Amino acid sequence: MKYTIDDFARLIDHTNLHADASNEDMKKLCDEAKKYHFKMVAINQVQSKFCSEQLKNTDIDTGAAIAFPLGQQTIESKVFDTEDAIKNGANEIDYVINITELKNKNYAYIKEEMKQMVNICHKYHVPCKVIFENCYLTKEEIKKLAEIAKEIKPDFIKTSTGFGPSGAKVEDVKLMKSIVGDNVKVKAAGGIRNSDDFLAMVRAGADRIGCSAGVKIIEALKQRMQDDNVTTIEINR
């Protein structure tokens, strides 16, 4: 498939999830998203209203992070926070699974949590992304989560929060994609800092990229295409 610069930009969730991010930082994030035509801004739940107002009358989504970054909230509180974020303008949701219950092999809990989160998101026609936080998981646990997701059908499964010991890995993206196929999309996030990282994740099967380096990545891709005198880059997946 051939990608233009705008195609690449529309794969990016432009991210600022720092605890000390000010309204000025959020405005900058939204302004950059508008300038580069990114798909979404990824922000903490409390900033949903501010960012959605900044992005009013655009096709750029406001993505709220729920139970972030540890996932250590009850299902009920995650559902409540999700609905609150949506009512305050969020139109995409990224939530972190309860890793403790996964480690306990309480797959019924994980399945119920995912089902309730998908249901509350889809009630409002909002995409739901499930964050695995792969750095804490074995390959078998990643596989098990992907199998559950294939059954429950969230819109995306996601590699990482970006706040753990490590972020997205090409082999994990390939594994996740190999299980869910075209039924569920895959988002890679965490440690994607340059255009080579970005292209590697897309080639591995990522349908969305979460990163704070979106501007740097798009500018580098523009330069690469200019140097090669091309308007598209072909990606074989």
UniProtKB/Swiss-Prot annotation:
One of its GO terms (cellular component) is cytoplasm. Its EC number is 4.1.2.4. SMART domains: DeoC. It is an enzyme of class 4 (lyase). Its main location: cytoplasm. InterPro entries: Aldolase_TIM, DeoC, DeoC/FbaB/LacD_aldolase, DeoC_typeI. The active site is at D94 (proton donor/acceptor), K158 (schiff-base intermediate with acetaldehyde), K187 (proton donor/acceptor). Pfam families: DeoC. Catalyzes a reversible aldol reaction between acetaldehyde and D-glyceraldehyde 3-phosphate to generate 2-deoxy-D-ribose 5-phosphate. This is Deoxyribose-phosphate aldolase. It comes from Lactobacillus johnsonii (strain CNCM I-12250 / La1 / NCC 533).
